[in-house]
Curated annotation (Swiss-Prot):
Organism: Rhodopseudomonas palustris (strain BisB5)
Entry-linked HAMAP family: LeuD_type1
Pathway participation: Amino-acid biosynthesis; L-leucine biosynthesis; L-leucine from 3-methyl-2-oxobutanoate: step 2/4
Gene, per the UniProt record: leuD
UniProt enzyme class: lyase
Protein name, UniProt field: 3-isopropylmalate dehydratase small subunit
Reactions that this protein is recorded to catalyse: (2R,3S)-3-isopropylmalate = (2S)-2-isopropylmalate
Assembly description: Heterodimer of LeuC and LeuD.
Amino acid sequence: MDKFTTLEGVAAPLKIINVDTDMIIPKQYLKTIKRTGLGKGLFSEQRYNDDGSENPDFILNKPAYRNAKILVAGDNFGCGSSREHAPWALLDFGIRCVISTSFGDIFYNNCFKNGVLPIRVSQADLDKLFDDAERGSNATVTIDLPAQEIRGPDGGTVKFEIDPFRKHCLINGLDDIGLTLEKKASIDSYEDKAKTERAWA
């Protein structure tokens, strides 16, 4: 998993509440267990028309937001069924941070496990970030994870809270496998001791 320290880029404003995981990545994309290639399915029912052409009105199809790294979204983002493909699709598209007032619990946890930072802010702060994001490619937003701070294009800042353990994992690029490997020396020591003390086992 790639480390996350600071992220600077365009933020796309998605002013829709209750975006569920089926909207993020429709069910037809769930057949694969590969984490790559899912970016094309991100919001596919909104991004594409029935004939496969792009919907020019959808935010991520607008020229200013095609390379967005940050998504500013409405309340209760990622609600609905459990599907780890949702953060996979965001990440494969290039989005590493989602900002909202609240998230679906399972989606929220899955984001951390896959290197995507979900940030909870107040409604007042979200409204300000929407205003910043609507400036398009002229507005760059910076996410500073060590400082737990969002910096807008006008220099304004928004502080956010994050669990210290999850912060440690993101900064050091540690997924579940990485966390296990971080304890490898202790695991090896325990196994060597167990072999000596319980040779009969």
